[in-house]
Amino acid sequence: MQAATVVINRRALRHNLQRLRELAPASKMVAVVKANAYGHGLLETARTLPDADAFGVARLEEALRLRAGGITKPVLLLEGFFDARDLPTISAQHFHTAVHNEEQLAALEEASLDEPVTVWMKLDTGMHRLGVRPEQAEAFYHRLTQCKNVRQPVNIVSHFARADEPKCGATEKQLAIFNTFCEGKPGQRSIAASGGILLWPQSHFDWVRPGIILYGVSPLEDRSIGADFGCQPVMSLTSSLIAVREHKAGEPVGYGGTWVSERDTRLGVVAMGYGDGYPRAAPSGTPVLVNGREVPIVGRVAMDMICVDLGPQAQDKAGDPVILWGEGLPVERIAEMTKVSAYELITRLTSRVAMKYVD
């Protein structure tokens, strides 16, 4: 009997990379594999995508794991380096790094490195999180062009704040700031992540940085799913029924007795709970698939178990397969029901969930 298991479909992952190339045919791809590849497994994901032009991570430790695992493609530190003492490692491993503040720039100017570092200057075009403000950007850029530890030319990167809101006007403003600054500068340019790839073709430039859409999940909050853009779900969260019980009308289920059956029915108990990373906030009615058909969760999600209403005529039995999200049940639907973003759902699964890779 299978307990909580994440099944990762390598074929779907490769399909999605190819689909994104179709959407941004003139751009190179930074496959973003931060946060354990959005819960899909850092090394296995990178090894599944040998055709990616580069990989993007948030931490130096992630980049080093890629190198130790045999990944030789360029690796971009999306948030840059956090300690000047990391610069010799970044140089020796030929990592690319974002540079977004005075402290990082000063560290580059003062370092003694065997080889220069490939730098992506981060311009704050409107996210107001990381990046050099436009009024300070020319002077910052000039110092990078004069720094002996920076491989020339300097590349330029930014990030959209509201790419998933095509009518708000913010993305057009960010693009205008980005284009104005980049004009006449020789480096590579990148501003589009998942939302930019899907909705803003004028933002694709030299490199795009697909994150969640690479894994077949829509970045948009408009009830769209990855399949709407030709992508396939890569992750399926699965488990099994561990019991099937006769349940009488009027009887409550689970902690607090929050759900009471209006009819005689059969309940299934699934080996899955918030101890596995399934959202405790999932209300009664949240769908799961049992033997390929949708049934609702009933009662509270517990640490190790959830209950589902199989229906009075159900023939399901202990050991039968359950899909919590994935093939046939998009994680975006679970996000909508639970009010927990799909980003969080797929990245917060716990260490006791087994990982299985299939082709």
UniProtKB/Swiss-Prot annotation:
EC number(s) given by UniProt: 5.1.1.1
GO terms of biological process kind: cell wall organization; D-alanine biosynthetic process; peptidoglycan biosynthetic process; regulation of cell shape
UniProt modified residues of type N6-(pyridoxal phosphate)lysine: K34
The protein's name in its UniProt record: Alanine racemase, biosynthetic
Influence of temperature on activity: Optimum temperature is 50 degrees Celsius.
NCBIfam families on file: alr (TIGR00492)
Signal peptide (from-to): none
Family of this protein: Belongs to the alanine racemase family.
Gene field: alr
Source taxon at top rank: Bacteria
GO cellular component, one term: cytosol
Purpose: Catalyzes the interconversion of L-alanine and D-alanine.
